[in-house]
Amino acid sequence: MTTSKRVAIIGAGPSGLAQLRAFQSAAAKGEEIPEIVCFEKQDNWGGLWNYTWRTGLDENGEPVHCSMYRYLWSNGPKEGLEFADYSFEEHFGKQIASYPPRAVLFDYIEGRVLKANVRDWIRFSTAVRWIDYNDETGLFKVTVHDHTNDRVYSEEFDHVICASGHFSTPNVPHYEGFETFNGRLVHAHDFRDAREFAGKDILVVGSSYSAEDIGSQCWKYGAKSITSCYRSAPMGFKWPDNWEEKPALVKVDKNTVFFSDGTSREVDAIILCTGYKHFFNFLPDDLRLKTANRLATADLYKGVVYVHNPKMFYLGMQDQWFTFNMFDAQAWWVRDAIMGKIDLSNVTKEQMLADVTERETREEASDDVKYAIRYQADYVKELVAETDYPSFDIDGACEAFFQWKKHKGEDIMAFRNNSYTSVITGTLAPVHHTPWKDALDDSMEAYLRN
């Protein structure tokens, strides 16, 4: 059964799907839930995990959402992101290795929502154009473009949940000489196939996960050399002999790149692994989240409630150690807030802002990686404790992350060959049948082969 309340969810990626599953879970227990409408601009669910060969614009002229590439494997252990209510073993019928390729993770994400039967709540190929809030009626007007029928229309909702992600709008810096660079210049968002760079000398600009993984992919598929450059600190791993880290890029002159230490090098391609922006071009200033990519997002009470309009929620806007299970914790909490099981009416704006400040202060208390992982783990625990989301061993998930960091430090090109224990089933993952550097086929069939 549904109440008269209407809820709009923006996006059917992992966060939006978590929200659909949360409402479906309540409905399955006999609770009355609001009418749910999820708008998704792509023709399928999965968000970033819904791979496309396209770059730039999609078939409808919308900016391509996908930032994933062929041969992408999870860069963190699956034991840190497993759904508490749907294990990898339940989905695949057996335990699988700890670092699955993209296609395997997409299949896992899809399996849970197929089981929950929530697809009818999603309007695919429907891009959100604008959202307004009317103070007099207390309703949001959501204007969308239905590409299937080439129709623009508006509907009203009591609540809006923004689950559109923040890893699809690239941050593209400019360096002197880019205009006359003679090689390939591409942002990680548009990187699709490492084989393109086989036999080439490449420069990777950046020192975070994209730089680490895209550089590693290019190494695996035969790049002649990799140079990566950093603005603040090197990644500092034990790189292969043909990979060197340099300080900040200063300028480019044709195919020569110059660094802040006075050195230079000839390269055939430059890959910008320079991050992404929180970008919401469908929201006015009074509804639009403005935050850096951090663990304690600005202006979000409990990390999800928009303090300037508590009828609006944001999911998954944090920098992330935990992913799918954190999105679940947030989605269950938002569901209960909307359904009145968590009472926001007596929380003042001042109290919400104080909550945000307290979270920021705690985040900034240390720059230690283990501290950051535990910080986000405590956040997940906090939300889970306030809802009926299935409890799971969050500390055990932290241990998987700690081991992952240790294994990366030991051998950055072999860390995916390790295995960890599921915190949901207690089963140790098998070691994958082929070492990562030799596993050139990333298909699900090849991965699941015994």
UniProtKB/Swiss-Prot annotation:
Key word Chaperone present: no
Principal EC category: oxidoreductase
Catalysed reactions listed for this entry: trimethylamine + NADPH + O2 = trimethylamine N-oxide + NADP(+) + H2O
Binding residue positions for NADP(+): W73, N75, Y175, S207, S208, S210, R231, R416
Protein's UniProt keywords contain Flavoprotein: yes
Keywords, alphabetical: FAD, Flavoprotein, Monooxygenase, NADP, Oxidoreductase
Entry EC number(s): 1.14.13.148
InterPro entries, per database record: FAD/NAD-bd_sf (IPR036188), Flavin_mOase (IPR000960), Flavin_mOase-like (IPR020946), FMO-like (IPR050346)
Entry cofactors: FAD
An MF annotation (GO) of this entry: flavin adenine dinucleotide binding
UniProt family annotation: Belongs to the FMO family.
Role of this protein: Catalyzes the oxidation of trimethylamine (TMA) to produce trimethylamine N-oxide (TMAO). In vitro, has a broad substrate specificity, oxidizing many nitrogen- and sulfur-containing compounds, including dimethylamine (DMA), dimethylsulfide (DMS) and dimethylsulfoxide (DMSO).
Protein name according to UniProt: Trimethylamine monooxygenase
Species the sequence originates in: Ruegeria pomeroyi (strain ATCC 700808 / DSM 15171 / DSS-3)
